[in-house]
């Protein structure tokens, strides 16, 4: 009787683990970049850790001196406010 409970538990946890990996693999196939929409978690990470607006070297190309680094875009802008709005 004890052996049957262990086998049942092993089968249950194996199926649970298989379901987890199947759901995880299915979630990795879902890409939101095709429509230029970032996931909220990704946006929060970019805002806190990597994204920043930096002033480029003078003279700036087309007077766009503030460049987004590591954010949603990698473009340069006329003002820091424009850069921050586009980058974060």
From Swiss-Prot:
Glycosylated. Expressed exclusively in endosperm. Found in basal endosperm transfer cells. Glycans are attached at residue 36. Its main location: secreted. GO terms for cellular component: extracellular region; plasma membrane. The keyword Repressor does not apply. It is found in: Secreted, Cell wall; Cell membrane; Secreted, Extracellular space, Extracellular matrix. This is Protein MATERNALLY EXPRESSED GENE 1. It comes from Zea mays. The lineage of its organism: Eukaryota, Viridiplantae, Streptophyta, Embryophyta, Tracheophyta.
